[in-house]
Amino acid sequence: MKEALLTYLNERIDWHKREQTRLRGEYRQDEAAHVQIAINVYNIFLSTYQAMKFDLGETLRRFSSIVSNWDESHRVACEHGDDTKKFVEEIKFARAMEIIQRA
């Protein structure tokens, strides 16, 4: 199961990177930015899975904790415009990586 999940995660990351390149080529920067968020989420999950020594149960608990903190940040960002949204996304990503590194 470990290898299948790792393969799946890496395939999803690769697909999203190709999609992002395509969108940028079509000058659809907003959509490409949303794809970057998806790439970040897959990378965070993958990093968490590796940090938890491939324990899927613990990975899901940690990842759920990380994601639950994003909802409030997203609501605040939506109320304050695009610059704030971008900043909040960067903060969420940095915070998630900090949590993973402490694991």
At which residue positions do the language-model features occur?
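Amphipathic alpha-helical coiled-coil segments
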Residues: 41-57, 95-103
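Short amphipathic alpha-helical heptad-repeat segments
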Residues: 1-19, 38, 56-72
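Generic N-terminal initiation segments characterized by hydrophobic and/or small/turn-forming residues
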Residues: 2-6, 20, 43, 77, ...
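Charged, low-complexity interaction regions
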Residues: 21-33, 54, 75-88
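Short linear sequence elements within intrinsically disordered, low-complexity coil regions
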Residues: 13, 32, 47-50, 54, ...
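Amphipathic alpha-helical binding modules
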Residues: 70-103
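Alpha-helical segments in soluble extracytoplasmic regions
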Residues: 30-38, 45
